[in-house]
Amino acid sequence: MYSFIECIAGALFVLGCVVVTLVVIGVRALLYNFRNRPAPPLSSQLGQNAPHVTIIRPVKGLEPRLYDCIAASFRQDYPQDKVSIRLCLEDDTDPAYPVLQKVIEDFPTIDARIMLEKEDHVLSETVNMGPNPKIRNLSRAYREAKGDIVWIIDCNIWMAKGVLGRMVDKLMGYRVGGAAKPYKFVHQLPIVVDLMDFSTSLAAEGRSLLDASPEEDHPTEDLGAEEFPKVMSHGGGRIDEMFMTTSHAKFYSAINTLRAAPCAVGKSNMFRKSQLDQATDAILNPKLDQSKNLPTGVDYFSHNICEDHLIGEALWTTDFPGYKSHGLVWGDIAVQPVSGMSVQAYTARRSRWLRARKYTVLSATILEPFTECFLFATYMSLAMTTIPVLSQNLGIPKTWNATAIAWFTITTLWMLIDYIGYLRLHSGVTMEVDEHTPYFAKGFKNTGGIKRRPFLEFLAAWIGREGLAFPVWAYAVVFGNTVNWRGRLFYIHWDTTVDAVEPREERTREVRTPELERGPSRNKHRVD
């Protein structure tokens, strides 16, 4: 008869085996699918037969390399008359407005417009429109989209020139040798690239965001004696880079390989407007509650947080015969440059993300700490040195020394696996490089790309990220139900709907994230 502690150890060991399985699937998917440059897209060669795509880019404030990121939409290898680009802002006082004007001036032959939320008169007349700032920002662009295919990309994302064509190929089912089954929703794997070089100063951050600049934007001055304070004030980008390229990348890849559940982070998503309209129409979709009287399309999610996840989930759960649910476009990476993000800003951003996820995918959020290295190594090492069958058959002693050895062994193996995946995603081996590719997107294996991170620099960021994982999770999930979102504070309900908190109410809310409550300013306090 097993004791209670042995039963708990057995349950944790089983959970650990599930986590190991996911890690193996995810890492294998990364190494296999990001080993070569993707083939040229087929849809780009269709001319007038290519489906029309409306690219929608919601913008809020200045971002590092904003010009490069927005201009990437204009440089796609796709028939120009089959692309419309809509850049969405709240109003023309946003500091990003001149950057968007410059991009449009530089590409006069492309159908591109800046759409201001304050000029959207239909928005105020929409019945039961909610407060979600991102949805309100892009509502008009979605409503007036040309053609059926919509590609929504965050303003701080850069993508290679062939991505549009390959995403259309995946969505439509185009492939060499015949048609494949089309998808309802396709998306990219996102990574973060920190522009900060900790062997030099912060000169790059002070340079103009209008520059399309490559290599000359590398910082040049020595950090000197103030290295530690500057690491704290600018090291959040490296920790965010670590999270997105290790933990997030491998589990994102695993879940999308298994296709067990909708898993899309929302940086770069493509779908059909007609299908989302049907999925959100209570008359056409019997699964919806007609009494709510919500608008259709993206406006349906204007009362919710995590709108990107919910859009993907709506298409996942709505039956469209002949279509697969979600498809990750392997090989193409959505690159997000960051610069000058403090460690506090990183923890605040992760807290916001986790707090939002708590209300949309509660079970996954509760289990998340068990997939983080330090906690995983702790419960697995304890389980391995507690379960009798392992002691009897494998000779693992039930001692604290054995537990410590197991912990360090597991942690080291986990770190090395993360390092391999990190190198693959930052190498640039799958990147289409041309004269317009910015240095941060080239990877360290291409000429003029980012520097390869020294191993000790990787290790320091990895330890920092893993060490912060549980405290940030506990703060976000346990201690609060408000988030700051695009400069406004919102209270989240358990049905994922949100209420904007008036300034006089803010003091009564439980927990706030001060780094997120400042105005938009490049990346240091970026929260979107």
UniProtKB/Swiss-Prot annotation:
It comes from the Eukaryota. A motif (D3) lies at residue 308. GO terms for biological process: glucosylceramide biosynthetic process. Disruption phenotype: Results in complete loss of glucosylceramides (GluCers) in mutant cells. Shows a significant change in the conidial morphology and displays a dramatic polar growth defect, and its mycelia are resistant to cell wall degrading enzymes. Shows increased resistance to plant defensins MsDef1 and RsAFP2, but not MsDef4. Its main location: Golgi. A motif (D2) lies at residue 154. Keywords: Glycosyltransferase, Golgi apparatus, Lipid metabolism, Membrane, Sphingolipid metabolism, Transferase, Transmembrane, Transmembrane helix. Residues 503-528 are annotated as: Disordered. One of its GO terms (cellular component) is Golgi membrane. It catalyses: an N-acylsphing-4-enine + UDP-alpha-D-glucose = a beta-D-glucosyl-(1<->1')-N-acylsphing-4-enine + UDP + H(+). The keyword Disulfide bond does not apply. It is a multi-pass membrane protein. Residues 1-6, 391-402, 479-528 are lumenal. GO terms for molecular function: ceramide glucosyltransferase activity. A motif (D1) lies at residue 94. A motif ((Q/R)XXRW) lies at residues 349-353. Signal peptide: none annotated. Its EC number is 2.4.1.80. Pfam families: Glyco_transf_21 (PF13506). The keyword NAD does not apply. The D1, D2, D3, (Q/R)XXRW motif is a critical part of the GCS active site, involved in catalysis and UDP-sugar binding. Catalyzes the final step in the biosynthesis of the membrane lipid glucosylceramide (GluCer), the transfer of glucose to ceramide. Glucosylceramides play important roles in growth, differentiation and pathogenicity. Contribution to fungal pathogenesis is host-dependent. This is Ceramide glucosyltransferase. It comes from Gibberella zeae (strain ATCC MYA-4620 / CBS 123657 / FGSC 9075 / NRRL 31084 / PH-1) (Wheat head blight fungus). The lineage of its organism: Eukaryota, Fungi, Dikarya, Ascomycota, Pezizomycotina. The gene is GCS1.
